[in-house]
């Protein structure tokens, strides 16, 4: 058995595995393997010339904390039935996470089929999505303020324009280009769907991608530059009232539809956990993000008697990671530069935390016990999962401490003094 990146000679085996494990149409499988699949970014378990398991590491860029960062979006997690329950996927996932680190990427994302499974690999929910269901006649009152046009490949630039404007207020959104939207148009058509752009005074100001599922108008995504454009989209949806009785709209948590329809009580607004994230390299992740925390440069202009309480804080945090042993250990977090940073206490500590529970230390026992005795006091213990939700801005330190049944200390509040962010992403592969 071998775990490695696949090659073009094994494309059919990877494709056969995908076809067996996922209920996608033949047309969609053709689309995916033509446009999205990259053998050099696909990890497999191969045995005797057969592909038993695979994980696809699809490459994306996210705008996270205002930074343009590369990441791997883990999709296509699959195993042939005869190889299930043998531990192949655990080994493959572990190896894949290390390979992501080797790409110089400090985090990964994944849309889970089961949150429990992926939490055991160090992933944590960092994105939710809002699903709105309502009677299509709830949208009757809205007015059109321009015209709609079905998107073709030539309008990919207009889609980029609308999308880039719409995500400016979100955290963690994927960065998309003309190639992405050309593929989205093709994907929607393959799935029996449509992509329409709304123009006002000749300028693109909104778009929606949707399918008509029986009598339900299902919006996969909608983005807009202003509320007037959104209301025109809602009127566009209503104009399908002879075909559809209901509408389902997938959108961001800050959607204002509840505020503008006349009777929101009869509609449903459901928050659904959507995307998980995973920190690959904790120290690098913080360097990549450059999260502003603490007083920063303003401390230098304070009176000397005030400066000691304004020059930043530090805490010691014990971090546990079930897969990437290099993340295990005790870190000193500080914000004295105005930017949140973390530094681990020595490689020996990392080695100690990476040891299996029943490891026999032999001659090393004495030095390791001395090292343990020299360790700093710990302010809090956090899992790599909890740190992902915190550093993505999905939860605050007060949230995490409350869930853990403890009170956040003043030092923790001073270190993690940033607020929750509105995280929104709507990528499927």
What are these model-derived regions, one by one?
Residues 79, 85-98, 227-238:
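Conserved acetyl-CoA-binding loop-helix of GNAT-fold acetyltransferases
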Residues 77-79, 222:
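Hydrophobic adenine-recognition pocket in adenosine-nucleotide-binding enzymes
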Residues 102-106, 112-130, 254-271:
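Conserved active-site alpha-helix within GNAT-family acetyltransferase domains
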Residues 40-44, 54, 76, 193-197, ...:
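Short hydrophobic/aromatic beta-strand element in the GNAT-like acyltransferase core
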Residues 125-141:
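Flexible glycine-/small-residue-enriched beta->alpha junction loops
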Residues 12, 147-429:
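Intrinsically disordered, low-complexity, positively biased terminal segments
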Residues 1-59, 66-73, 140-179, 213-218:
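Short amphipathic alpha-helix that is part of the acyltransferase structural core
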Residues 93, 98-112, 242-252:
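Conserved GNAT acetyl-CoA-binding A-motif
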């Amino acid at each position: 058995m071998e775990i490695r990146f696949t090659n073009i000679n094994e494309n059919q085996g990877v494709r056969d595995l995908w076809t067996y494990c996922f209920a996608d149409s033949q047309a969609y499988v053709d689309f995916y393997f033509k446009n999205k699949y990259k053998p050099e970014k696909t990890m497999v378990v191969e045995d005797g010339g057969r592909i038993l398991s695979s994980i696809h590491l699809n490459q994306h860029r996210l705008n996270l904390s205002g930074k343009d960062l590369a990441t791997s979006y883990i999709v296509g997690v699959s195993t042939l039935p005869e190889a299930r329950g043998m531990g192949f996927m655990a080994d493959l996932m572990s190896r894949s996470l290390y390979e992501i680190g080797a790409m110089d990427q400090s985090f990964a994302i994944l849309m889970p089929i089961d949150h429990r499974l992926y939490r055991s690999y160090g992933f944590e929910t960092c994105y939710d999505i809002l699903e709105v269901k309502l009677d299509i006649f709830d949208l009757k009152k809205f007015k059109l303020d321009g015209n709609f046009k079905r998107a073709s490949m030539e309008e990919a630039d207009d889609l980029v324009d609308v999308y880039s404007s719409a995500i400016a207020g979100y955290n963690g959104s994927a960065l998309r280009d003309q190639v992405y939207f050309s593929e989205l148009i093709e994907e929607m058509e393959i799935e029996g769907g449509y992509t329409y752009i709304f123009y006002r005074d000749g300028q693109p100001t909104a778009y929606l991608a949707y399918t008509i599922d029986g009598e339900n108008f299902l919006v996969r995504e909608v983005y807009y530059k202003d509320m007037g454009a959104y209301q025109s989209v809602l009127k566009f949806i209503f104009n399908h009232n002879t075909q559809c009785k209901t509408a389902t709209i997938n959108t961001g948590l800050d959607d204002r539809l509840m505020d503008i329809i006349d009777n929101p009580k009869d509609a449903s607004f459901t928050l659904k956990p959507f995307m998980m994230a995973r920190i690959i390299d904790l120290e690098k992740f913080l360097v990549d993000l450059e999260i502003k925390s603490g007083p920063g440069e303003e401390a230098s202009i304070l009176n000397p008697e005030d400066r000691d309480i304004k020059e930043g804080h530090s805490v010691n945090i014990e971090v546990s990671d079930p897969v990437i042993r290099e993340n295990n250990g005790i870190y000193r977090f500080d914000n004295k530069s105005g930017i949140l940073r973390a530094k681990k206490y020595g490689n020996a500590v990392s080695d100690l935390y990476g040891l299996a529970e029943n490891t026999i230390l032999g001659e090393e026992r004495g030095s390791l016990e001395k090292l343990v005795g020299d360790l700093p006091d710990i302010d809090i213990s956090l899992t790599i999962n909890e740190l992902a939700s915190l550093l993505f801005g999905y939860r605050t330190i007060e949230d995490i401490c409350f869930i853990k049944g403890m009170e956040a200390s003043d030092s923790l509040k001073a270190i993690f003094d940033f607020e929750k962010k509105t995280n929104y992403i709507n990528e499927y592969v």
